[in-house]
From Swiss-Prot:
This is GMP synthase [glutamine-hydrolyzing]. Keywords: ATP-binding, Glutamine amidotransferase, GMP biosynthesis, Ligase, Nucleotide-binding, Purine biosynthesis. Homodimer. Its EC number is 6.3.5.2. ATP binds at S228, G229, G230, V231, D232, S233, S234. GO terms for cellular component: cytosol. Catalyzes the synthesis of GMP from XMP. Pfam families: GATase, GMP_synt_C, NAD_synthase. Gene3D superfamilies: 3.30.300.10, 3.40.50.880, HUPs (3.40.50.620). The gene is guaA. CDD domains: GATase1_GMP_Synthase, GMP_synthase_C. Residues 201-386 form the GMPS ATP-PPase domain.
Amino acid sequence: MSAIAIIDFGSQFTQLIARQVRGMGVYCEIFPSNISFETISKFNGFILSGGPQSVNDDCSETSRVVHEIIKLNEATSVPILGICYGQQLICHYFGAKVKESFKQEFGRTKIKILKESPIVKDTWDVNSEVDVLMNHADSVDTIPQGFTVIASGVINQTIAMIVNEQRKIYCTQFHPEVKPTTNGSKLLSNFLDIANCKRDWTMKSFIEEQKEKIKNVVGEKKVIAAVSGGVDSSVAAALTHKAIGKQLNCIFIDTGLLRKNQTIAMLKEIPINYVDKSNLFLSRLKGITDPEEKRKIIGNTFIEVFEEEAKKIGDVDFLMQGTIYSDVVESGHASDNTSTIKSHHNVGGLPEKMNLKLVEPLRYLFKDEVRLLGKEIGLSDEIIFQHPFPGPGLAVRIISEVDKEKVQILQEVDEIYINTMKNYDLYDKIWQAFAVLLPIKTVGVMGDGRTYGYVCALRAVTSSDGMTADAFPFEDKDQHLLVFWDFLRNVGSIIVNNVPGVNRVVYDITSKPPATIEWE
């Protein structure tokens, strides 16, 4: 089976490279930058990710793996693709000058294609201007010997893409793995062709591989699982159950922070124990306003409850979680070099000395892959295609302190928002939609009286993997916008007229980046 090694230097987008490669039917693995060369020496090609460092700083460990990969390339012509910091590392190795950019570039920009190359075959035409995503403070200032400039920045004349065709080394300052880059996936596909990769990796093969891994790790021991009714925990539970059957014990904990009338979607043949701990969670959140502290309290309490329930079951050694890769990336656990954006319920806030070992069968899958997996193992569309819901629940959608009254207000708003969205046939067009209760009150008028109520923010985004997202709607189609505008006016009116305590509704139009999808 063909395989690509992705060397992770700490980019927030590294996992998107893997998602793109796997989506093209090629197996790939992600390795930290301190990986031993023996581990990666047999791969068909190498992709060097971006990262937050500068090649002008001390990076001896980083340089080691790059030097070894380039030496392998010299001996075997194994293809290399360097992205952003990866480009800078390659250029630095060959003696080119990399310096801090006169004007740093973060976000969408345009590049101009200057020459043809196999890496841009059927991707972009020569002399065309292309939208790409840049995310760099440093840039390449001189061209290494043997390399040719294929593209440059339209505004800043950044060296955007260089190649050494003889050595099969390709470098981009921009990020082809991120959707704002037009046709970036085709560039990656061209690299896989250059590396002679067969497109033979499938979700079915991943499922069989994970089942075997779960069996080998767990053996004959019992596993306790957190299930919330959401996509991730449901798919993880179903996959684990297929691997070990009755050894899996699923528990649904009511934290008091769920959607109104939220119930666990039926998972056939998997028994589920229900535990109400809403008073415990709400009491521990009293007086807490910092979002990270909320997450850690919820994470600690969650594990504490599971440990208590595990004792009741007896002889439990493992805790299964529905952690997916976007959780890991945003928490800074994918690489030692990755900056933490925010901790996630499934990967942050865990006690340092946890009495249960972790089983995370979805840890290296993105949301769209999780849905494909769920479909493959026979879960219903009701489970698979529901919108994501955060592990900490409404606690991270109530800005500032959480209490029972605020939870009830937000539950009412959320129910109206989602149900009205479904009535407008918009729900399935949107990746994630939710309401946020803000920590401010504003003056309003209802009837002949003055009101002083909460402001509620509505959010709806489109995405495929949760790593980047656009506010919905993102297309300038008049009819599309008119329908959504009518929906917003209608749902805002319904909310303020039916939810006591709320007198103003606003809509969040921010994309990711620079914002995250959730507010906290």
